[in-house]
A protein has these predicted regions:
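Residue-level recognition of oxygen-bearing side chains
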Residues: 50
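RNA-contacting regions in translation and RNA-metabolism proteins
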Residues: 1-43, 53-76
Length: 76
């Protein structure tokens, strides 16, 4: 799942080297903490958070196969 998130993020940002994704896995859930360059943060979040919400929706759909709850957090 991390690879899918990585691919999505890489296609949205200019500074691919600054991408950092931390995966915290629990018993029934996974939390992804995403950090990108400050200049790219707006591209990840989008107008009114629509891109961020779309990323979260895609990850929830992917996680349904593994029967785990996924949360994606975008950190400054």
């Amino acid at each position: 799942m991390k690879e899918i998130l990585q691919t999505i993020i890489e296609n949205l940002v200019d500074d691919k080297a600054s991408i950092s994704i931390n995966e915290i896995e629990g018993e029934k859930s996974i939390v992804f903490e995403v950090k990108v360059a400050e200049a790219d943060m707006g591209k990840i979040i989008g107008k009114q958070g629509k891109i961020a919400q779309s990323i979260r929706s895609i990850m929830k759909a992917v996680s349904a196969k593994e029967h785990k709850r996924v949360s994606v957090e975008f950190l400054d």
